[in-house]
Amino acid sequence: MSSVVIYCRSGFENDAAAEITFHAAEQGFAGYVKAKPNTGYVIYECFDAQHGDEIIKKVDFKNMVFARQWFAGTLIENMPVEDRVGAVVEAAKDFTLCSELRVETPDTNEGKELLTFCKKISTPLKKALEKRNIVLREPKANRPVMHVLFLTNNTAYVGYSYSFNNSPFFMGILRLRMPSDAPSRSTLKLDEAFNVFIPEQQRESRVAAGMRSVDLGACPGGWTYQLVRRGMFVSAIDNGPMNDDLMQTGQVKHFRADGFKYRPEKRNITWLVCDMVEKPTKVTSLMIDWAVNAYAKELIFNLKLPMKKRFDSVYECLSMIRAELEKYGISYELQAKHLYHDREEVTVHLNVTKVPQSLYS
């Protein structure tokens, strides 16, 4: 497979293109990008036909900020309308046995118009693939996932991703329901972040009732809502007013203070969350200060992106975090993602696993 197909938010094609080019080159692969504005996907064409498969194995998908999903694939054009199933099966005849089939479209208005067609063709296509022993009847762990990305009703990229290095979600999107009692739609960003960044088997222990948390820039309480919902006690930091229902839970203490100046009196905070509108480097510096001083164990924060050079801006901030934490000998895990519920921003998760006591004692 010479092509790597990457799904992204419409309008972020240049950022996804810059990112795959960067990571492919870092692993020693060469190629070029094909991208059109507002299409919701980009194609990385490898100069070596075998390298598409190698890229989706060797580049860690968790390091891809702007990619919602990816797969190694090939383009099928002008499929006969009377036998599109046969055309897809023929293109996939040499695939390793896959655990499941995902028939998808780009997340654009044009793509959404194809979703009904995708659902309609999925059943006969899956049966045909099962018959040819290309896709299993029942999903099985640790097997590749087959993708068919329809661009039109007779044009599609057909390929596969590896279950250990992809997004588990259809179209790479985790869809969440807006709680009717949440103070703002921003609540979905933190809900998605917990689901994306924290492995399901660890969620109960790492995001647990009784934990102490801090929400910087909390007003009116969209992110605080998610912390309260999970049973945490929250210090909400904001000069603005908080939602009355949240305050009546008894789990929230409101501090009218500047989020950039506030620091906790004790180092007993498990979660720090922050969704303040400020320059990304300024927010990053604040988060580094909290991490280096062991004020919180895990941090989730948003970086508001500039109109241009969004890829450069994000990677500059991630490099700042790595450089500072490594300078002080701090052990950590770092991941960033342009989540489905994000807009002109990305969400970062920093898990501080060990801070030398000499830094803050």
UniProtKB/Swiss-Prot annotation:
One of its GO terms (molecular function) is S-adenosylmethionine-dependent methyltransferase activity. SUPFAM superfamilies: S-adenosyl-L-methionine-dependent methyltransferases. Keywords: Cytoplasm, Methyltransferase, rRNA processing, S-adenosyl-L-methionine, Transferase. Its main location: cytoplasm. It catalyses: cytidine(2498) in 23S rRNA + S-adenosyl-L-methionine = 2'-O-methylcytidine(2498) in 23S rRNA + S-adenosyl-L-homocysteine + H(+). S-adenosyl-L-methionine binds at S186, C219, P220, G221, G222, D238, D258, D275. The active site is at K304. It is an enzyme of class 2 (transferase). Its EC number is 2.1.1.186. InterPro entries: RlmM_FDX, RlmM_THUMP-like, RNA_MeTrfase_FtsJ_dom, rRNA_MeTrfase_M, SAM-dependent_MTases_sf. Catalyzes the 2'-O-methylation at nucleotide C2498 in 23S rRNA. HAMAP family: 23SrRNA_methyltr_M (MF_01551). Belongs to the class I-like SAM-binding methyltransferase superfamily. RNA methyltransferase RlmE family. RlmM subfamily. This is Ribosomal RNA large subunit methyltransferase M. It comes from Pseudoalteromonas translucida (strain TAC 125). The lineage of its organism: Bacteria, Pseudomonadati, Pseudomonadota, Gammaproteobacteria, Alteromonadales.
